[in-house]
Amino acid sequence: MVVIGLDVGYGDTKVIGIDGKRIIFPSRWAVTETESWGIGGKIPVLSTDGGQTKFIYGRYASGNNIRVPQGDGRLASKEAFPLIAAALWESGIHNDGSPVDLVIGSGTPLGTFDLEVKAAKEALENKILTVTGPEGEVRQYNVTRLIMRPQGVGAALYLLNQGIIEQQPGYGVVIDVGSRTTDVLTINLMDMEPVVELSFSLQIGVGDAISNLSRKIAKETGFVVPFDLAQEALSKPVMFRQKQVGGPEVAGPILEDLANRIIENIRLNLRGEVDRITSLIPVGGGANLIGDRFDEIAPGTTVRIKPEDLQFANALGYRDAAERSM
């Protein structure tokens, strides 16, 4: 029996595999008719229907025909299925052609939790997923159980398991800064249960900052910059059209504006409960960029997570929850 943690986000797909192996790739894929080659060699092409339909994924998928998830953690959607297949393939789990018994720990936002869990279990649980690789290798995965937790609970469970936070009176607020949304989950730290009325999703994410920086670079160079390059330019200067663009000095004001909008909306939604917050927990890719600002919401309560764990916090917690359920 193999247990993995899987976090299919709108921006990136994260996997915690065997021996804690960590995998991350952009959450996008595209149907392809031919094999392609990149600088590093042949681009991986997968299939989930015996080779009839082939697709590329992650950073290799580009152009006008790319497909992306409908939202975070929507595992039952047809847009997410190739990403799940790619995640399993990338994990390296296989058993010489015979099915591997697999338990998947994953999560989805609290607002649609029951609906998404029901759909995901119907789509994946007790099903054998067959993935064909670029050289015709076939790997099969028997999903014996799918353990789902609300998005954000995964991060809290991981931190609790690591001793970074403790069960205590008060609220823990997980702020997951994603590509398209910022999901806020408030947890009662005594019983680790979500506080539904203080949990919400903001239609604000790092993608807003990327789009703003992309427009700024386009105005400067006269060319539209690829999304991936604009994303990289948020944190460091990059070369584009033989010119150095982006970097902290250029992106700083854009990220400040993003942080201000998120903080203002969180304060508004938490209303008079801020005094009960004992742990603010920024996670997600955006937390690397603006996480330090969240201490303004409840000074002195921000939990510092290792930078390399920020993007994987939910997936780590999902895997832990799946292991505990066995």
From Swiss-Prot:
Keywords, alphabetical: ATP-binding, Nucleotide-binding
Superkingdom: Archaea
Binding annotation for ATP: 10-14, 179, 231, 285-288, 311
Any Pfam family hit: MreB-like_C
Molecular function GO terms recorded: ATP binding
Protein name: Archaeal actin homolog
Similarity-based family: Belongs to the thermophilic archaeal actin family.
Function: Polymerizes into bundles of filaments. Polymerization requires NTP and is optimal with ATP, but GTP, UTP, CTP, and even the deoxy form of NTP can also support the polymerization reaction.
